[in-house]
Amino acid sequence: MATRLFTSESVTEGHPDKIADQVSDSILDAMLKDDPKSRVAVETMITTGQVHVAGEVTTKTYVDIASVVRERILEIGYDSSKKGFDGASCGVSVSIGSQSPDIAQGVDTAHEARVEGSTEDDLDRQGAGDQGLMFGFACDETPELMPLPIALAHRLARRLSAVRKDGQVGYLRPDGKTQVTIEYEDGKPVRLDTVVVSSQHAADIDLDTLLAPDVAEYVVEPELALLEISTEGRRLLVNPTGRFEIGGPMGDAGLTGRKIIVDTYGGYARHGGGAFSGKDPSKVDRSAAYAMRWVAKNVVAAGLASRCEVQVAYAIGKAHPVGLFVETFGTGKVPDAQIQDAVTQVFDLRPAAIVRDLDLLRPIYAQTAAYGHFGRPELDFTWEATSRADALTAAVKG
């Protein structure tokens, strides 16, 4: 019997890196709302009293970026200098240029149309916005077909934020982190080993008599009651440093794109390295990673495997992927090559087809920027749909 421990973490919406992600995606949404064909690549850096926004944008609309920044930060909960940051009074600097015409050329007129003479299919006209490799993953450990460690870490982080916002534990502040360690036997989750919760809090809050008991009662225990695995002997560590009064941008500078493992599968699956937030769907870093999750989830939903990881790769300016790889880690009901062939029959992985099939030219991205881009049953993400599972099964059967 092979036993191992696996750990994943999540962070709340008030973590400085997540503030940056949400600001970048809020700016993206504001542009897509009025001009769905906007090209956007926006990075945010946030530190004590300051927010810096930079990037490249081509759009027909006007967005008051400073107002978008302030509104998002205030919604997160940083609305007072007593909390270490105030969205209403912080400094906001903006440095935005236009998208490089060299990049635009490859996206607007793909290599297939420009060089290879393929003009009959409109989907061949849009090239990938960059080269790169993207991964998607799904497994049957949870109803949402996500790995249990990251799924539970996200649930705890969402609840930590919820009890702050609804006043149940009103002395909490927006910055927080959760971490979950699960024991596996023969590849299956069997026991919760350790939970770590760190939360920023108001001054003069006693850890042992107030904070730790409140976190246990209102955050941790309600989630553990829903688990189907053993919690016997589990450890709970709350604010292990002893104090967490200084948090958010005052405690650490935040940057867009620094929580790519939290955004995806908690380290349980491979990652191509590209961040998501602040990027419109012409950037395959984002859209193709969403598509790979869609593919992998449909493979598992179809019962073709209990674990599935899919890699796709693109060349900048080309519409068709240059590589596709399906791996089921020995859990496939048929050979991986057969599943891969079925994927190519059922899914069109050209960038324009992904944007069309997943309806990505919409202002939907700010809600993805905290608590994970995948496995969100409370949100209606198109890449979480399993409506192509039957088609995959039929394609495998031939």
Curated annotation (Swiss-Prot):
Binding of Mg(2+), residues: 17
Protein name per its UniProtKB record: S-adenosylmethionine synthase
Residues engaged in binding ATP: 15, 175-177, 243-244, 252, 258-259, 275, 279
UniProt binding sites for L-methionine: 56, 99, 252, 283
CDD domains found in the cross-reference section: S-AdoMet_synt
Native species: Parafrankia sp. (strain EAN1pec)
UniProt GO BP: one-carbon metabolic process; S-adenosylmethionine biosynthetic process
Pathway: Amino-acid biosynthesis; S-adenosyl-L-methionine biosynthesis; S-adenosyl-L-methionine from L-methionine: step 1/1
Quaternary state and interactors: Homotetramer; dimer of dimers.
Gene that encodes it: metK
